[in-house]
Amino acid sequence: MCVSRLVLLLGLLLCVGAQLSNGQHWSHGWYPGGKRELDSFGTSEISEEIKLCEAGECSYLTPQRRSVLRNILLDALARELQKRK
């Protein structure tokens, strides 16, 4: 009974403390609500990425599943070898 009251009191204090604190941190260039300053993006960077994608050289659009699976398997094998030593 005493433990349940203590847990309830701690939970209530946590909720009230979270509401009263000013714990939100905004990174440089970001505004409340996740909005970002548009001037921070370089237009040349964006246009270069678009040009590469139009030419069919978008490396981030091609599936990288084989290399990911290969890396997972290699890591698993390396762990097994370390366990045996």
From Swiss-Prot:
The keyword Signal applies. Keywords: Amidation, Cleavage on pair of basic residues, Hormone, Pyrrolidone carboxylic acid, Secreted, Signal. GO terms for molecular function: gonadotropin hormone-releasing hormone activity; gonadotropin-releasing hormone receptor binding. Residues 1-23 form the signal peptide. InterPro entries: GnRH, Gonadoliberin. The modification Pyrrolidone carboxylic acid is found at Q24. It comes from the Eukaryota. Belongs to the GnRH family. This is Progonadoliberin-2. It comes from Sparus aurata (Gilthead sea bream). The lineage of its organism: Eukaryota, Metazoa, Chordata, Craniata, Vertebrata.
